[in-house]
Amino acid sequence: MAIGLVGRKLGMTRVFTEDGASLPVTVIEVDPNRVTQVKTEERDGYRALQVTTGARKASRVTKPRAGHFAKAGVEAGRGLWEFRLDGDQGAEIETGAELKVDIFEAGQIVDVTGISKGKGFQGVIKRHNFSMQDATHGNSLSHRAPGSIGQNQTPGRVFKGKKMAGHMGNERCTVQNLEVVRVDVERNLLLIKGAVPGSTGGNVLVRPGVKAKG
C-alpha cells in the first residue's frame, strides 16, 4: 500500500485541454490530513499511518476518541482512516504532521475508494445487468424476471452467491487507474478524470494506483 489522502467529493465538472478537448472531472476537496498515530510492527503488528481530516464539534466526539486526538496533539476530525505502509515507507512522518494535496501531481494514476450511492432494493436487470426476456410472443408475466435459479430435487437448493434481486449500492468500492488532471494546492482541490464512487459530500480515499504502469 501507499500513502494517500482522505478527501470530500464536491461533484463533477469539466475542463478543457489545450487542444480543446472536454474532459469530465470529479472535484475532490482534500483538506490537510493530520497524522493521529504512526502504527509500528513492534507495537501494533503492522505499519500504518492513521489520519484525520476536517473538524468536528467537541460535543460530537466521544471521550476515548477525544483523548486519542489530544494525545496526538491534533484537532478532532470527522473520522479516522489508515494507510498501510510497506518497508521503510513514511519513516520520516511523525504524529501531528500534516499531509497535503501536493503529494499528488498532474498526470499521476490513482485509485479512489468511497461508499457507492444506495439504490435500495433492485431487480436483477439493474443490479446484475441481466437481459430482459421477451416483451411479447406469449410472455406476459416474466419480462424482468431472472429466469431459472436452480435445478431440480438434486441439489434441491439455490446455490450460495446466486445473482438475484436484492439491496444494491451503499457499499465500499474502489475505482482504479484514474488520472489526476489538476492539483490546486491553494484551494486544496484534486481534479480527477472520470467518476468516483459516492454522493456529493461523501468521504473518499485517494491513493497512488496499485496497477499503475511505469
Curated annotation (Swiss-Prot):
GO terms for molecular function: rRNA binding; structural constituent of ribosome. The modification N5-methylglutamine is found at Q153. It comes from the Bacteria. Keywords: Methylation, Ribonucleoprotein, Ribosomal protein, RNA-binding, rRNA-binding. GO terms for biological process: translation. NCBIfam families: L3_bact. Methylated by PrmB. Part of the 50S ribosomal subunit. Forms a cluster with proteins L14 and L19. This is Large ribosomal subunit protein uL3.
